[in-house]
Amino acid sequence: ATLVGTIGKVSGAHVNPAITAGLWTLKKIPTPNALIYIAAQLLGGASALAIVEYVTNSDVVASGMSTMDGRVFLAEALGTAIFGFGVAAVVMQKLEGMQAAFTVGASLFLGVLVAAMAAPGFLNPAVALANNSWDRTTVIAPLLGSIVGMNVYSFFLAPADSLKSSKKK
């Protein structure tokens, strides 16, 4: 919520590759921008990992999720779907300011709460990379979850004028 409130107007608060991918499927972000955002987000995650390892003079220990666990995958996907649903509501209703920050923050909180029942609750592949927990579950599940959550919102609840504007772009 803090990032939405502070940098949302400047950059759209693009700090999560899963959310960026979901917005791209809704045609809210042009393909070149989505690719640049995702590359920058992953570079940020890798940089954070490198800085922490340098400053602490030790390797960051991974969370230990080296195998595909269906429960963890489902928890990460469902948590990110909830988060993506909230972000889609903000974007498609054109919410701004504290209303946008609260909606994004609340959906992130609920998403992490759900995901944390069986998973680390990253909901963000760049954060998983920064935590040295980059694997199929922490990359694919949030991507799928965000895409599903955003498209469910778009299909069932999006205001008609938000659908028209996304098709013009």
Residue ranges and their predicted role:
Residues 1-169:
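Membrane-interface helix-loop junctions and terminal tails of multi-pass membrane proteins
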